[in-house]
Amino acid sequence: VIIFVLEFNLYMEKEEILFWLPRVLAILFIVFLALFALDVFVPGESILYMIGGFLVHLIPDYLLIAALIIAWKRERIGGVLFILLGLGFTIFFRTYSALSNFLIVSFPVFLIGTLFLCHKYLVIRR
């Protein structure tokens, strides 16, 4: 799959790459974060407790999905939203205390927001 994506990207223009890259990265990051919500499913707990915990653990994903939906059509607003979410993740999850935590949780959100803004300004310049 990765080889196909890399080969496909070789034939894309810079503008097309900047269009799809933040969207694909956002989807992959949302799926990555959703994996952490699966830790609530443990034997011996009630199903309602586990489902409630699962839905609460997915709150960051809900925010990212909302930002992605907005960014898909309104890149400037979406890019700013992603950067603000990155700042919120940094503060709320305290990723500023360890570089590895910052690089895993907050940096991808900042990067996605920056890529949305870069594409928007590249399109404006043309």
Q: Where in this protein do the model-derived segments appear?
A:
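Short, Lys/Arg-enriched N-terminal segments with co-localized hydrophobic residues
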Residues: 1-11
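Alpha-helical transmembrane segments and their immediate juxtamembrane flanks
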Residues: 15-21, 25-29, 37, 42-43, ...
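Aromatic-anchored segments of alpha-helical transmembrane domains
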Residues: 30-37, 84-94
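Membrane-interface helix termini and inter-helical loops of multi-pass transporters
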Residues: 41-51
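Membrane-interface helix caps and helix-loop-helix hairpins in membrane proteins
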Residues: 46-47, 94-102
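Alpha-helical transmembrane segments of polytopic membrane proteins
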Residues: 52-61, 103-107
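Hydrophobic, membrane-inserted alpha-helices
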Residues: 62-68, 85-90
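Membrane-helix interface "capping/anchor" motifs
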Residues: 69-80
